[in-house]
């Protein structure tokens, strides 16, 4: 029988500061002084109580500053419920990364985890989302923009013509998207910000369809207009 026992959450929570060099005698490391307090403490919603009640109590007892913000993120569910080994429905991150790549997995998780509610993940949903967003919407936009810029101007596009109404409309959408995304990121609404970004990408693809650079390229007299359209597309993308 042990004579001394330590509450598991006391031991676990203090690792946030001891791991970066906190010293109770006042000799904390430069890394601790640089990194603490945390600007954002990102945790799972199931352990909010420990991070917003117990952890602040521990820190105040030590006269150490509290994290500036705490965000309890939602869960990713498999189908209609939690993943469980007993149910055999667990998705392992390593398997997803090996198949899709780490950036694609990161994108899906950020997109499918709403601010207020739990998200859903499955192999089928990942394939559908990545094909729809990264391949069709973003991939198509990047491919069209680069291909036409290389084909018609050797990859170097200069502003040679005056902007028309359709150009100014795209510019306004870009500016408005920046403001909306910045505000949502400040509020940790990452999924909502991603939705706004991809709405812009869809607008850019529509702009290409509206201006028809491939038609303009057939008329040498419209070379300046062609350059302007591709410049706006490049800047927006």
How should each PLM-predicted stretch be described?
Residues 1-5, 232-237:
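Conserved small/polar residues in nucleotide/adenosyl-binding loops
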Residues 3-151, 193-197:
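Structured secondary-structure scaffolds
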Residues 88-92, 166, 173:
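Short acidic-hydrophobic sequence patches enriched in Asp/Glu that either
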Residues 112, 125-163, 170-234:
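Helix-rich, typically C-terminal accessory recognition domains appended to large enzymatic cores
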């Amino acid at each position: 029988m042990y004579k001394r026992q330590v509450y598991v959450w006391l031991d676990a929570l203090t690792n946030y500061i001891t791991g970066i060099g906190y010293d109770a005698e006042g000799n904390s490391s430069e890394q601790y002084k640089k990194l603490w307090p945390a600007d954002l403490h990102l945790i799972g919603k199931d352990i909010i109580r420990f991070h917003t009640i117990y952890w602040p109590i521990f820190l105040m007892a030590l006269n150490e500053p509290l994290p500036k913000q705490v965000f309890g993120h939602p869960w990713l569910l498999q189908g209609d419920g939690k993943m469980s080994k007993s149910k055999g429905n667990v998705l392992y991150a390593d398997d997803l990364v090996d198949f899709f790549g780490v950036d694609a997995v990161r994108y899906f998780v950020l997109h499918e985890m709403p601010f207020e509610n739990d998200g859903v993940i499955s192999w089928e949903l990942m394939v559908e989302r990545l094909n729809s967003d990264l391949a069709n919407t973003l991939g198509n936009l990047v491919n069209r923009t680069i291909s036409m810029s290389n084909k018609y101007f050797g990859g170097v596009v200069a502003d040679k013509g005056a902007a028309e109404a359709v150009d100014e409309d795209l510019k306004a959408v870009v500016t408005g998207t920046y403001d909306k995304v910045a505000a949502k990121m400040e509020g940790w609404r990452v999924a909502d910000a991603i939705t706004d970004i991809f709405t812009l990408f869809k607008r850019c693809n529509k702009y290409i369809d509206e201006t028809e650079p491939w038609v303009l390229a057939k008329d040498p007299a419209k070379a300046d207009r062609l350059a302007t359209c591709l410049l706006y597309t490049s800047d927006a993308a």
